[in-house]
Regions:
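Short, strongly hydrophobic alpha-helical membrane anchors
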Residues: 1-14, 258-262
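Functional transmembrane core segments of multi-pass inner-membrane proteins
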Residues: 21, 112, 117-223, 255, ...
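Alpha-helical transmembrane segments of multipass membrane proteins
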Residues: 28-33, 95, 99, 150, ...
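Membrane-proximal soluble regions of multi-pass membrane proteins
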Residues: 32-87
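Core segments of transmembrane alpha-helices
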Residues: 91-98, 139-147, 196-198, 234-239
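Transmembrane helix-loop-helix
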Residues: 104-114
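Interfacial loop-to-transmembrane junctions
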Residues: 192-194, 225-244
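Juxtamembrane boundary at the C-terminal end of a transmembrane helix
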Residues: 248-262
Length: 262
């Protein structure tokens, strides 16, 4: 269900929704950063106030304004004067851009909200995986719930549901088998259980063909970054590839289907 396509709106309305989407992305980028840090340190991201990771001082409202607080404080904690990681403003700006890109693709619609939740989950789990090499189940559960709840509003027929659910289970089973075989052959853990569950969610959102391209793209990028490293988290590469396919994958999927004449 699309409320507004941006192409149908006047220029000032387009600017309004773009700015709104960017601010929404900033706010959620800040929240996801905090949530990821708390999850990685076995803390609840629902209870308690935000704190400085250096001095543990509770942060006030003026410390939590996305981007603005970082710039105003000169990139340092107002209490202990220790430098604040540049990761915070970068992720806030980045997720603001991600939000705008999805708005341009989906318009003001339920699909935008669904994709926003999906991107939020990918973003959060990537930050956690980068820090502790684990993908939190909660992010995957939220993504699955968002997908299910969106179905009545995006004109999803039974064929759509069967294809996407089938792709989800297909990817999960295929990578589970591959992981077991590779673990046996190499004598060590290869693909983590979190990665397998993430592929399930990717199949649910993207379907079979776009999901396959996601696997290929994630593997290529991961191989490039893996040079000289003994271990890398795979979740961020899957997430980046999945988001790129979510936004730009339709032409690639259409080309592939036409090539095999489906």
């Amino acid at each position: 269900m699309v409320l507004f396509e941006l192409s149908e709106l006047e220029t000032w309305m387009v600017a309004y929704f773009v700015i709104l989407a960017f601010i929404l992305g900033n706010v959620f980028g800040s929240f996801l950063n905090c949530a990821a840090w708390r999850i990685a340190h076995n803390m609840s991201f629902v209870k308690g106030h935000s704190i400085c990771p250096n001095c543990q001082h509770e942060l006030g409202a003026m410390d939590l304004i996305p981007i603005v607080s970082y710039v105003a404080s000169g990139g340092r904690c107002r209490y202990c004067k220790e430098p604040i990681s540049i990761r915070y403003p970068i992720t806030e700006v980045l997720f603001g851009i991600i939000s705008v890109v999805m708005l341009v693709k989906d318009g003001v619609s339920v699909l935008y909200l669904r994709d926003f939740v999906f991107a939020s989950c990918l973003f959060c789990l990537s930050l956690v995986d980068l820090e502790i090499y684990e993908i939190p189940n909660g992010t995957l559960i939220v993504a699955i719930i968002a997908w299910v709840l969106s179905l009545p509003f995006i004109n999803a027929d039974m064929n759509y549901i069967v294809i996407h659910v089938g792709a989800a289970f297909g990817f999960a089973i295929a990578f589970l088998v591959l992981s077991l075989v590779m673990d046996k052959m190499l004598g060590k853990d290869t693909l983590g259980g979190g990665d397998i569950k993430l592929f399930f969610v990717v199949g649910l959102y993207l379907g079979l063909v776009a999901g396959m391209f996601t696997v290929i793209l994630a593997a290529i990028v991961a191989l490039v970054f893996a040079r000289g490293r003994e271990r890398i988290p795979f979740g961020p590469f899957i997430s980046i590839a999945a988001w790129l396919m979510l936004i730009f994958g339709n032409p690639l999927v259409q080309w592939y289907l036409e090539m095999i004449q489906i």
